[in-house]
Every structure is written in C-alpha cells, then in structure tokens.
C-alpha cells in the first residue's frame, strides 16, 4: 500500500485592493506540492465585515490578524503553516507570526507594505475620483496587465455601495500602519520579494534595508516589476516560492539579489523570466 504523504498547508493572504483571484496564476503550480488555503479576510461587501463595522469596530491590521487566526484554528488546524502574502497581507501575516511563532513555518512576502516610508495608494483615487484605470494601472510596471476587463471589474465593484463602504472603512483603519517595530521579532525563515519599479511603495531601497532587520530574511528584487509580482512575474514567482518553501532555493540568482540591486542604486538588471 502506498503511504499517503500529507501536503503542508500554505496560506495565501492578499492585499488591500486585491481579492483571492489575484492568486489565480500561482495556485495551480503551488498546489502540486502544498495544500493551498486562501482565507477571505477582506470581502468588502460581506456580512461579517459589515457586522463588525456596524458594531463600531475598526478594520485594522490587528483585527485582520485575529480573523486569520480564527480561520486557521477553525478550518485548517494543521500547524505549522507556511504563509505567502502580498502588500497589506504581509502586515497581517507578520502580526500573526509574532503573536503565534509556534504555529508558523516559513514566510514569503511579496511587495510588503508598512516596512518603511509612505505608500502611494491608487485605491484612494479610485474611490474618490472614480478613476479605475489609474487605480489598476499604477499597480503594474507594464500597462497591459491593466486590461479593460480588470478595469471594468473594479468599476462594477465600486458601484456597489456596500463594497465601497467596506473599502473606505478598511482604508481608514489600515493606511499608515507600520510593522517596522515587529521586524526584529520575526524568528522565522522569510523570503522577501520586491518589484524594482514598484510605484505604490515610496521607498523600495529603504524598505529593503528595513527588512534586513529580520534575522532570517533573504531578499530578492525583480527588475521591470511593479507592486504585484505574483501577477506580473508569475512564472518566476511560482518557481522561487515553491523552491523556497521546499528548502530547494539554495542560492539567489545574482540578477535578482537585493544586495546587488542596492549597490547598483536600483538600476534595472536584465533577468530571464
């Protein structure tokens, strides 16, 4: 009889302006080796979020980290968990990891916010000016990712008053939040991946230096990439993440090594993807 080998759980946590669909190009590849879970922490028109809002609750990073913990305890129950997060989702993961170190395996952070400096949040302009093309386009290095279908999808969402209220409440509770004071407290092996041309983060070099305070961090910078590496460079990201979580990423290719990138003052270095 063939012995069944349980796949380790990997939890995907998306960012502020993203939904679970943002992982569509990654999940099939990672599912070959891992049990992928995607908690819906930010369903902006969902009853759970609005019940919390109507009771006077704030939609904050600690609140989202608490919701993540409830999801894991009730529906996964197989620690330790590996985590892959994007943007704001990285703050949620680190908040959970510092509070529950024994339940966390490895961590991968994609374009994490809240490490250093300000953020240029296109979602605010999308809400205030109904400029959905700007909202979507500013996230990516190459504008063809901001196609008409994606722009139309956001336009439809923002016309839903309940969805828009959920976004606004989340913005008020999370904009400007920092996890800089947590970085030195993270004991886990962590891979941090940045887009060299990220226009959402105001200071990528400063953020890289801040991430160096994590005692077990390895860092990568991807040229010609914006704030959504998992979408823009999905093939490269899929390989890096899969190898890292399986202890097979022995070396960082020099073309994407963060230390080398900093020495070149952020100059783009060609990389085969």
Task: Describe each region flagged by the PLM.
Residues 3-50:
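Conserved HGGG/HGGXW glycine-rich cap/lid loop of the alpha/beta-hydrolase fold
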Residues 37-84, 239:
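Active-site loop/oxyanion-hole signature of alpha/beta-hydrolase fold enzymes
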Residues 85, 89, 93:
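Gly/Ala-rich beta-loop-alpha elbow adjacent to hydrolase catalytic centers
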Residues 94-99, 105-134:
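Flexible "cap/lid" loop of the alpha/beta hydrolase fold
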Residues 127-188:
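Conserved alpha/beta-hydrolase catalytic His-Asp/Glu region
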Residues 172-212:
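Conserved serine/cysteine hydrolase catalytic core
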Residues 217-273:
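Catalytic active-site module of serine/aspartate enzymes centered on a nucleophile-bearing elbow/loop
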């Amino acid at each position: 009889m063939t012995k069944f080998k349980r796949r380790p759980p990997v939890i995907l946590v998306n960012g502020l302006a993203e939904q679970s669909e943002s992982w569509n190009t990654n999940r099939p590849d990672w599912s070959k080796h891992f049990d992928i879970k995607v908690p819906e922490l930010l369903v902006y028109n969902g009853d759970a979020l609005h019940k919390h809002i109507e009771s006077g609750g704030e939609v904050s990073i600690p609140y989202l980290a608490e919701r993540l913990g409830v999801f894991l305890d009730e529906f996964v129950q197989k620690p330790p968990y590996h985590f892959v997060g994007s943007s704001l989702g990285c703050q949620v993961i680190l908040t959970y990891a510092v509070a529950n170190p024994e339940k966390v395996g490895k961590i991968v952070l994609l374009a994490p916010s809240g490490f250093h400096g300000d953020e240029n949040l296109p979602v605010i302009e999308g809400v205030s000016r109904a400029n959905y093309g700007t909202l979507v386009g500013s996230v990516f290095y190459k504008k063809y990712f901001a196609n008409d279908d994606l722009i139309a999808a956001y336009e439809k969402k923002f016309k839903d008053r309940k969805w828009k209220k959920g976004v606004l409440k989340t913005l008020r509770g999370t904009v400007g939040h920092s996890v800089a004071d947590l970085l030195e407290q993270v004991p886990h092996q962590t891979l941090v991946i940045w887009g060299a041309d990220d226009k959402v983060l105001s200071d990528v070099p400063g953020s890289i230096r801040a991430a160096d305070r994590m005692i077990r961090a390895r860092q990568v910078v991807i040229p010609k990439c914006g704030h959504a590496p998992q979408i823009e460079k999905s093939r490269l990201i899929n390989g890096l993440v899969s190898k890292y979580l399986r202890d097979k990423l022995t070396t960082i290719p020099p073309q994407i090594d963060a230390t080398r990138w900093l020495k070149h003052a952020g100059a783009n270095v060609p990389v085969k993807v």
